[in-house]
């Protein structure tokens, strides 16, 4: 849920990047970085390649902090369980290969592009909780003279397998 609940363990061995410095979390999920210049903004982020579970994703990409002088500042970096998004693109039941799909988080507007495989299937690991749309890239539709549907769905926290077997249908455009 993006918050450490009582009794929930911290994530150990996660690389945290603080400006030009890095630190690994200890067995409780805590990390420490020293000698950060006071009053200067610094970006803090989790190196997602250091997470031991590929479904864990940082709740936010980066945090910008401005540390005070001679003081300790706590900054929690929450992880959430992402979903697996998988399905196929079809035209009259036949797979549509090598098309670009656009996954859009409707809250943030952030877009992610992905391509279908040769058999028309697609797969994305670690989709953050939220409301999304998925559609074939309009440029691909225009180039192939197709029209397509837009899927609207919600990725819910803690349910990684909820977005399986999605079917995105396209059809020939009217002339």
Regions found by a protein language model. Give the residues of each.
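Conserved "repeat-terminator" motif of extracellular CCP/Sushi domains
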Residues: 68-83, 165-175
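Short, acidic Ser/Thr/Gly-rich low-complexity loop/linker segments typical of extracellular
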Residues: 4-6, 10, 17-30, 106-121
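Surface-exposed coil/turn segments at beta-strand junctions on protein surfaces, enriched
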Residues: 24-26, 37, 68-70, 78-82, ...
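Hydrophobic beta-strand segments
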Residues: 14-16, 99-105, 134
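Short Pro-Gly-centered beta-turn/loop motif in secreted/extracellular proteins
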Residues: 11, 32-43, 47-50, 119-141
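Structural motif
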Residues: 1-11, 87-99
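Structured interaction patches on ligand/partner-binding surfaces of diverse proteins
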Residues: 50-73, 139-165
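Beta-strand-rich structural segments
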Residues: 46, 81-91
């Amino acid at each position: 849920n993006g918050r450490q609940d009582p009794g929930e363990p911290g994530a150990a061995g996660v690389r945290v990047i603080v400006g030009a410095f890095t630190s690994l979390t200890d067995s409780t999920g805590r990390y420490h970085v020293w000698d950060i210049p006071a009053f200067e903004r610094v970006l803090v982020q989790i190196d997602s390649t250091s997470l031991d579970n590929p479904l864990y994703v940082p709740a936010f990409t980066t945090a910008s902090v401005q540390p005070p002088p001679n003081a300790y500042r706590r900054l929690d970096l929450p992880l959430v369980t992402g979903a697996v998004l998988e399905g196929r693109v079809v035209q009259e039941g036949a797979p549509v290969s090598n098309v670009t799909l656009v996954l859009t988080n409707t809250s943030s507007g952030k877009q992610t592009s992905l391509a279908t495989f040769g058999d028309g299937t697609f797969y994305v690991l670690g989709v953050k909780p939220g409301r999304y749309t998925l559609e074939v890239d309009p440029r691909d539709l225009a180039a192939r003279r197709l029209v397509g549907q837009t899927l609207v769905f919600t990725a819910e926290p803690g349910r990684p397998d909820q977005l399986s077997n999605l079917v995105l249908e396209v059809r020939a455009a009217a002339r």
